[in-house]
């Protein structure tokens, strides 16, 4: 019984492969122009990347490294002072 079922499945798979559309059929709704899609994706990704690099290098966006940080770990007051902890 397994041999018959396996042969029927192989036959059905083979028949569907014989009836498949030509991959170069440009009238098919499942035909995609992969080259144009790739070029369009590179343009859509490269434009914001180049724009970001231009903005960073233009000097309009200045990072202020000379300022002192607002919070230094050495200046923080201690959270637990002697006598403030209670035994419950």
Swiss-Prot record:
Keyword Membrane: yes
Membrane topology: Single-pass type I membrane protein
Family: Belongs to the FXYD family.
Gene responsible for this protein: FXYD3
Example of a GO biological process term: potassium ion transport
One example GO MF annotation: sodium channel regulator activity
Modifications made to the protein after synthesis: Glutathionylated.
Chain segments annotated as transmembrane: 39-59
Signal peptide positions (record): 1-17
Disulphide-bridged cysteine pairs: none
Pfam families the UniProt entry points to: ATP1G1_PLM_MAT8
Protein's name in the database: FXYD domain-containing ion transport regulator 3
Gene3D superfamilies tied to this protein: Single helix bin
Extracellular side: 18-38
Cited InterPro entries: FXYD_motif, Ion-transport_regulator_FXYD
Function: Associates with and regulates the activity of the sodium/potassium-transporting ATPase (NKA) which transports Na(+) out of the cell and K(+) into the cell. Reduces glutathionylation of the NKA beta-1 subunit ATP1B1, thus reversing glutathionylation-mediated inhibition of ATP1B1. Induces a hyperpolarization-activated chloride current when expressed in Xenopus oocytes.
Keyword Transmembrane assigned: yes
Residues in compartment: Cytoplasmic: 60-88
GO cellular component, one term: plasma membrane
Source organism per UniProt: Sus scrofa (Pig)
Chain segments carrying region Disordered: 66-88
Cellular location(s): Cell membrane
Summary of subunit composition and partner proteins: Regulatory subunit of the sodium/potassium-transporting ATPase which is composed of a catalytic alpha subunit, a non-catalytic beta subunit and an additional regulatory subunit. Interacts with catalytic alpha subunit ATP1A1. Also interacts with non-catalytic beta subunit ATP1B1. Interacts with the alpha1-beta1, alpha2-beta1 and alpha3-beta1 NKA isozymes.
Keywords, ordered alphabetically: Cell membrane, Glutathionylation, Ion transport, Membrane, Potassium, Potassium transport, Signal, Sodium, Sodium transport, Sodium/potassium transport, Transmembrane, Transmembrane helix, Transport
């Amino acid at each position: 019984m397994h041999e018959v079922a396996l042969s029927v499945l192989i036959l059905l798979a083979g028949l569907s492969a014989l009836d498949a559309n030509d991959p170069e059929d440009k009238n098919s709704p499942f035909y995609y122009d992969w080259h144009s899609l790739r070029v369009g994706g590179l343009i859509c990704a490269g434009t914001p990347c180049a724009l970001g690099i231009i903005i960073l290098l233009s000097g309009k966006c200045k990072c202020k490294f000379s300022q002192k940080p607002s919070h230094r770990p050495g200046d923080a007051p201690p959270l637990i002072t002697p006598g403030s902890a209670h035994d419950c």
